[in-house]
């Protein structure tokens, strides 16, 4: 029973972003460009990614 995993990499800085976008990056466990996290795919995570889609790169694993 393996769930899909997503590798989320922050590619841009949060300088100039809104408070909501900064909070979302922090909630994802990111903080600086080129940091990445591996998370299980779910609708909640997809919503967070949509908020900061211009700041991150997402790859399926």
UniProtKB/Swiss-Prot annotation:
Alphabetical list of Gene3D superfamilies matching this protein: Ribosomal protein L30, ferredoxin-like fold domain
GO biological process: translation
Assembly, per entry: Part of the 50S ribosomal subunit.
Organism: Chlorobium phaeobacteroides (strain DSM 266 / SMG 266 / 2430)
Pfam families tied to this protein: Ribosomal_L30 (PF00327)
Gene Ontology molecular function, alphabetical: structural constituent of ribosome
Keywords from the UniProt entry: Ribonucleoprotein, Ribosomal protein
Cited SUPFAM superfamilies: Ribosomal protein L30p/L7e
Statement: the UniProt record of this protein carries the keyword Ribosomal protein: yes
Protein name: Large ribosomal subunit protein uL30
Gene Ontology annotations for the cellular component aspect, listed alphabetically: cytosolic large ribosomal subunit
InterPro entries named among the record's database cross-references: Ribo_uL30_ferredoxin-like_sf (IPR036919), Ribosomal_uL30_bac-type (IPR005996), Ribosomal_uL30_ferredoxin-like (IPR016082)
Family: Belongs to the universal ribosomal protein uL30 family.
Keyword flag Ubl conjugation: no
